[in-house]
Amino acid sequence: HSQGTFTSDYSKYLDTRRAQDFVQWLMST
């Protein structure tokens, strides 16, 4: 159960990272 929570939190973290990278890429273009 805790493993599933960790995995879901981790994918949320990755999504946030990806979104921030995307925004920075847009700004730098």
Curated annotation (Swiss-Prot):
One of its GO terms (cellular component) is extracellular region. Signal peptide: none annotated. It is found in: Secreted. Coiled coil: none annotated. Keywords: Hormone, Secreted. GO terms for molecular function: hormone activity. Induction: Produced in the A cells of the islets of Langerhans in response to a drop in blood sugar concentration. Transmembrane segments: none annotated. The keyword Secreted applies. Glucagon plays a key role in glucose metabolism and homeostasis. Regulates blood glucose by increasing gluconeogenesis and decreasing glycolysis. Belongs to the glucagon family. This is Glucagon.
